[in-house]
A protein has these predicted regions:
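A structural signal for short loop-to-beta-strand junctions that line the ligand-binding cleft
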Residues: 11, 41-45, 92-104, 191-196, ...
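Short helix-initiation/N-cap motifs at beta->coil->alpha
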Residues: 46, 61-72, 153-167, 202
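A ligand-binding cleft/hinge motif common to bilobed small-molecule-binding domains
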Residues: 69, 85-94, 142-145, 166-167, ...
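Flexible hinge/capping segments at coil-to-helix
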Residues: 112-130
Length: 244
């Protein structure tokens, strides 16, 4: 039984084909960023999955996806594994996860000139506040739960929620502390609201086919080994990332 399971596993398929297919969105700085001119990717996730492919002894192939189809594409066998994704139980109903290797939390981002109006989470739960979110992201459900009284602007990738904020069509977007730090550095008109504490501390892991325990076990062993050897810590530091 074990030999049959191994033979039918995605692990054996990857080894036989010599290619690891990785689903990535290319729009989460600094985790995964796509250069449209070259169609190449860079970021924390790219370093992680390149290392995984190297340890498997195979090539890596990046498959473009977006947040609303990230889980469906793993179940449809469009790729073998994803880059980093927030762990949530809705996704876990239909896809498997590796063990986590990074932790983040969520903060609100506003126009810097609006900091006088917004100082904590409760300030956004008002009928005259417009909250932006990207379809299919963890934040889409999160902001509806956080701010039921607010107006919700849900936009579809490749557009992003923070672009609504930049265009003044929204008052706030909620994103990870990771992305928020890169946004306020890139766009000087934006600021992170100094809330009392970030919300929803969340593990980050890779998505895998739910019914392939052999493949999940292999990836979990790899993650544990690399965590122990300091690989994830060093890679996070390279990209200016700080785990919660």
């Amino acid at each position: 039984m074990t030999q049959v399971a191994h033979a039918n596993s995605r692990l054996q398929e990857v080894l036989d084909k010599g290619v690891l297919r990785v689903g990535t969105t290319g729009d989460w700085n600094p985790m995964t960023m796509k250069d449209p001119a070259t169609n190449s990717y860079r970021g924390f996730d790219i370093d992680v999955t390149t290392e995984l492919a190297k340890d498997l002894g195979v090539k890596v192939e990046y498959v473009a996806t977006d947040w609303k189809t990230l889980v469906n594409d793993i179940t449809a066998n469009k790729y073998d594994i994803t880059g980093s994704a927030s762990l949530n139980m809705s996704r876990a109903k239909v896809a498997g996860y590796s063990q986590p290797y990074f932790y983040l939390a969520f903060v609100p981002v506003v126009q810097k000139k609006d900091l006088a109006k917004f100082s904590d989470w409760a300030d956004f739960d008002k009928p005259d506040v417009k909250v932006a979110a990207t379809l299919g992201t963890v934040q889409e459900k999160m902001v509806k739960d956080f701010f039921p009284s607010a107006q919700h602007i849900v936009i579809e990738a490749p557009a992003r929620d923070f672009q609504e904020l930049l265009a003044r069509r929204a008052d706030v977007s909620v994103t990870s502390n990771v992305e928020a730090a890169t946004l306020v550095e890139k766009f000087k008109q934006l600021a992170i609201v100094p809330v009392k504490e970030p919300r929803k501390p969340t593990p980050i892991a890779m998505l895998l086919p739910q019914d392939d325990q052999v493949w999940i076990n292999y990836i979990n062993h790899w993650v544990e080994l690399k965590k122990t050897q300091g690989f994830f810590k060093q890679t996070a530091e390279k990209w200016g990332l700080k785990s919660m």
